Curated annotation (Swiss-Prot):
Gene3D superfamilies named in the record: Ribosomal protein L33
HAMAP family reported for this sequence: Ribosomal_bL33
Primary gene name: rpmG
Protein name as it appears in the record: Large ribosomal subunit protein bL33
GO molecular function: structural constituent of ribosome
Protein's organism: Flavobacterium psychrophilum (strain ATCC 49511 / DSM 21280 / CIP 103535 / JIP02/86)
PANTHER family: 50S RIBOSOMAL PROTEIN L33, CHLOROPLASTIC, LARGE RIBOSOMAL SUBUNIT PROTEIN BL33C
One GO-annotated biological process of the protein: translation
Family under the similarity heading: Belongs to the bacterial ribosomal protein bL33 family.
Keyword vocabulary terms for this entry: Ribonucleoprotein, Ribosomal protein
GO cellular component: cytoplasm; ribonucleoprotein complex; ribosome
Taxonomy, superkingdom: Bacteria
InterPro entries, per the entry: Ribosomal_bL33, Ribosomal_bL33_sf, Ribosomal_zn-bd
Amino acid sequence: MAKKGNRIQVILECTEHKASGVAGTSRYITTKNKKNTPDRLEIKKFNPVLKRVTVHKEIK
């Protein structure tokens, strides 16, 4: 059997969207190497609902 890889799929969710009170949510799916980055990802991505770049954090 082949062993499991180090690269896993993670979901990033906007942190500023909940506080704004606007309906909907902004989520992105990406991959990360769990050996190189064991902690949660925090990336600035575009939020199409708020129409600006916001911080997206990994959820699980």
